[in-house]
């Protein structure tokens, strides 16, 4: 088990960080698939250790407080149909739920697109007091292709050159936040042919 995930199995100590590992990266970088394959290698993942999709929790919370909002049909609509003020309020309640479900692996965006601009909220990860971050990144052309072929999602189109900038900002932001908060950090380069190699880095 890598140092990033090993802390999830240890008994909590007074004053220690929460037993949370955030797996992050821009949309379409392969986080979901990597996590699903990683979970198959350890029966405790999904049972003793929760696997939480922050965006899905956020979407569910919005449906609870505003069930008549037809503009938001999935988590992909959160970044274009919900104001930043509403998102901020909902995020705080979702963070409380995530903390309550630790130890957990959290699939989340540290830097995310909100109505056409990249948003970063270090207060959220500071409140979560995570053990470590795992940043999943990939080739921009490959990300664009994965997004195109993922018919179950409704992502906004993004050219490869924009993906380069978005991915670099997200990567460096996550690295800096981890350093400032004293959390662990690991970057994983994701390709179609190295899933087993990446899983071995996390085990």
Residue ranges and their predicted role:
Residues 149-197:
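Small-molecule kinase domains that catalyze NTP-dependent phosphoryl transfer to phosphate-bearing small molecules
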Residues 108-151:
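ATP-dependent NMP and nucleoside kinases share a basic, alpha-helical "lid"
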Residues 50-118:
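ATP-dependent small-molecule kinase phosphotransfer cores
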Residues 29:
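ATP-binding Walker
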Residues 32:
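Walker A/P-loop
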Residues 23:
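Hydrophobic anchor at the beta1->P-loop junction of P-loop NTPases
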Residues 26:
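P-loop (Walker A) phosphate-binding loop of NTP-binding proteins
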């Amino acid at each position: 088990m890598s140092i990033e995930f090993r802390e999830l199995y240890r008994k909590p100590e007074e004053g220690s960080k929460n037993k949370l590992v955030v797996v992050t990266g821009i949309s379409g970088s392969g986080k979901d698939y990597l996590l699903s394959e990683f979970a198959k290698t350890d029966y405790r993942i999904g049972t003793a250790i929760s696997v939480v999709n922050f965006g899905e929790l956020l979407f569910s919370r919005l449906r609870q407080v505003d069930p008549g909002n037809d503009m938001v049909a999935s988590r992909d609509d959160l970044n274009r149909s919900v104001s930043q003020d509403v998102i901020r309020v909902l995020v705080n309640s979702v963070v409380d739920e995530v903390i309550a479900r630790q130890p957990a692996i959290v699939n989340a965006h540290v830097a995310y697109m909100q109505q056409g601009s990249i948003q970063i909220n270090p207060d959220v990860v500071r409140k979560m007091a995570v053990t470590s971050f795992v940043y999943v990144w990939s080739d921009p052309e490959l990300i664009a292709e994965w997004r195109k072929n993922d018919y179950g999602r409704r992502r906004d189109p993004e050219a490869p050159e924009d993906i380069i900038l978005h991915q670099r900002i997200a990567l460096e932001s996550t690295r800096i936040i981890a350093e400032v908060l004293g959390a662990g950090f690991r970057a994983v380069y994701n390709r179609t042919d190295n899933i087993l190699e990446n899983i071995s880095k996390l085990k």
